[in-house]
Design a protein with these regions (language model features):
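Class I S-adenosyl-L-methionine-dependent methyltransferase catalytic core
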Residues: 2-217
Length: 217
């Protein structure tokens, strides 16, 4: 795939032991609370809405059950690398898959990609964004709670100097399913948005957009 692999990268205060362990030492608790699958149709929805011209390698660093990857594949034939700290059974011979990979560790093998597209665990959203902005050469697209835009730490560590270029706020609510289990209706539905950092521009302005989910189009 022509991907340059190294063990470099500078995560400053987040390096050394890996950010997963730094933010939450209890893997079982984190796994139980933080894996919520992204609706595949909403991945296609945002890519079609943005009309993102993807030219290069895409990295999905927390692929879970492959819901995000499947949406990307419906939009583009660009090469995809997908990884996760846990093997949830997702398989696809058309992409590069790497399980048992801690995205926030200094040992993570994929340190350069053109795009990062992800829905990170919310408790780790800050270090995931920081790492993604280091890795991505062209852009970072993230699905996450609207709550990401608030908070002193996130403002200080990310939003002040690296605000997203565009934010698409859902007009209606989108359901994400715990542990990827679509047979269990979520107890509550969060307010979500898509965030895009355009690495090809130096602008620090953020454009705000509104987005209907696929079910209301």
């Amino acid at each position: 795939m022509g991907l340059l692999v190294s063990n470099g990268g500078n995560m400053g205060k987040y390096s050394k032991k890996g950010l997963y362990s730094a933010y939450d030492k209890n893997h079982k608790e984190r796994d139980a609370l933080d894996y919520y699958s992204t609706p595949t149709e909403e991945v296609l929805n945002i890519l079609e809405t943005m009309q993102l011209d993807i030219d290069g390698i895409i990295l999905e660093p927390c692929c879970g059950g492959g819901h995000m990857v499947k949406g990307i594949q419906q939009y583009t034939n660009a090469p995809i690398i997908a990884s996760d700290i846990k093997d949830r059974g997702f398989r696809d011979d058309n992409i590069t898959l790497a399980y048992g990979q801690d995205y926030l560790s200094d040992d993570y093998p994929f340190f350069i990609a053109d795009y990062v597209i992800m829905n990170p665990p919310f408790k780790l959203i800050e270090p995931f964004v920081i790492r993604s902005l280091e890795i991505a050469q062209k852009g970072v697209l993230m699905f996450g709670r609207l709550q990401f835009l608030e908070g002193q730490n996130r403002y200080k560590n990310i939003l002040k100097d690296n605000p997203p270029s565009d934010v698409w706020v859902y007009i209606d609510r989108v359901a994400c399913f715990k542990n990827g289990n679509t047979s269990i209706k979520p107890d509550s539905v969060q307010a979500y948005a898509w965030y895009y950092w355009d690495k090809t521009t130096s602008t620090k302005e953020t454009k705000l957009h509104w987005l209907w989910s696929k079910k209301h189009q």
